[in-house]
A protein has these predicted regions:
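Core alpha-helical transmembrane segments of integral membrane proteins
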Residues: 234-243
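Bacterial N-terminal signal peptides
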Residues: 6-17
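Positively charged n-region of N-terminal signal peptides that target proteins for export
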Residues: 1-5
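Soluble extramembrane regions of membrane proteins in the secretory/endomembrane system
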Residues: 20-234
Length: 243
């Protein structure tokens, strides 16, 4: 009888421990968490700004626990980037940028405004000098304001601002990162990791969710509406001169 009781106690204790371990594992990997994945693609312009305003407001209203911005953009309008940066900074939800291809110019500014940055192995970020629509360098006043904005974005997320400044100011000298004086800084994933501009390098979304301990979270993928697609097309700087 005593042996039987000991066996039952052992079985119960083992089962209880496994149950607790399983529950803790679920919590640790995002069980009952809600994650919004919002794309930042193509040019940064007013249409993208409106899309991000709508989707981040929706994420907030739905009680999202995390927002992931999947970034692939060559850059775009400085004014729209500034407004989107404010939208991101005003969020009370943890944010992560996943650079799937490139976050150049205004794209790097947006990434720097998020809490975390992860990069695909072939991704790049930087090259953020301000140019006019005809491809010439902007005036000194505009350049100075943009450099200050890049610095502020880096500082807001606890990153060393000298690299953000070098992305926007070709007068900086960082030859060890392939950006001697006269060149804008562009970071590879390994370089971004080295200077503290990326938390990790991941090949896909599954790996990213694992790194963020959100593997078991409920995922909501945001997408543009037809009206937003039209608005983005009409706001494209290539299209505007034709209209």
């Amino acid at each position: 009888m005593r042996f039987f009781i000991l066996v039952m106690v052992f079985i119960y204790t083992t089962f209880f421990s496994l149950h607790i371990s399983f529950a803790e594992n679920n919590v640790r990997h995002g069980e009952n968490k809600l994650v919004y994945i919002i794309p930042i693609e193509r040019e940064v312009e007013r249409g993208l700004e409106a899309f991000l305003k709508r989707t981040t407001e929706e994420a907030t209203e739905e009680g999202a626990n995390h927002i992931i911005f999947e970034i692939d953009t060559p850059g775009g309008r400085v004014d729209s980037a500034s407004q989107i940066g404010k939208i991101i900074n005003n969020l009370d939800i943890p944010t992560t940028s996943y650079i799937v291809n490139e976050a150049l110019s205004a794209g790097s500014y947006l990434a720097l405004n998020t809490d975390n940055i992860y990069m695909h192995p072939q991704a790049t970020m930087g090259a953020s000098g301000v140019i006019t629509q005809d491809g010439n360098a902007a005036d000194k006043k505009a350049q100075s304001a943009w450099i200050a904005a890049m610095q502020s974005a880096a500082e807001s997320s606890g990153r060393d601002p000298k690299y953000a400044i070098a992305m926007a100011d070709a007068e900086q000298d960082l030859p060890e990162l392939g950006a001697p004086k006269g060149e804008f800084l562009t970071l590879s994933p390994s370089e971004a990791l080295e200077v503290g501009y990326a938390e990790g390098i991941v090949t896909n979304r599954v790996e990213l969710l694992h790194e963020l301990q959100l593997t078991n979270a409920t995922i909501v993928e945001s997408d543009t509406t037809l009206a937003e697609d039209v608005a983005r097309f009409l706001a494209n700087p290539v299209v505007i001169p034709i209209l």
